Amino acid sequence: MSMSDPIADMLTRIRNAQMVEKVSVTMPSSKVKVAIAQVLKDEGYIDDFAVKAEGAKSELNIALKYYAGRPVIERLERVSKPGLRVYRGRNDIPQVMNGLGVAIVSTPKGVMTDRKARATGVGGEVICYVA
């Protein structure tokens, strides 16, 4: 069965794993998922991630992060969906929780945070909000 929105599946797997306090979560890998995981790691929302390739299939394993017994990620919300893509210019990229959260944006220069996209001067597709 083909998946209509693999990024939403990734975010849901992370959300569900954190609700039951799992140490890590595994999912099918792709270049975009790895780029999103890299942004989450750079921003301190996850401990680490690894890509394990087994033949033609590769899996992305994300080590989740907790602070004082609570998940570091409080909000993980998909913005741009296959049925309704959300694109923002460099001046219209939203701030999440007045700068306390992060919007992950797919730009021509790669997947990056809203702050980095504004600093670089590029717009793109708003993938999700993380707080």
Curated annotation (Swiss-Prot):
Gene3D superfamilies: 3.30.1370.30, 3.30.1490.10. It holds the Pfam family Ribosomal_S8. The keyword Disulfide bond does not apply. GO terms for cellular component: ribonucleoprotein complex; ribosome. One of its GO terms (biological process) is translation. Keywords: Ribonucleoprotein, Ribosomal protein, RNA-binding, rRNA-binding. GO terms for molecular function: rRNA binding; structural constituent of ribosome. InterPro entries: Ribosomal_uS8, Ribosomal_uS8_CS, Ribosomal_uS8_sf. One of the primary rRNA binding proteins, it binds directly to 16S rRNA central domain where it helps coordinate assembly of the platform of the 30S subunit. Part of the 30S ribosomal subunit. Contacts proteins S5 and S12. Belongs to the universal ribosomal protein uS8 family. This is Small ribosomal subunit protein uS8. It comes from Paraburkholderia phymatum (strain DSM 17167 / CIP 108236 / LMG 21445 / STM815) (Burkholderia phymatum).
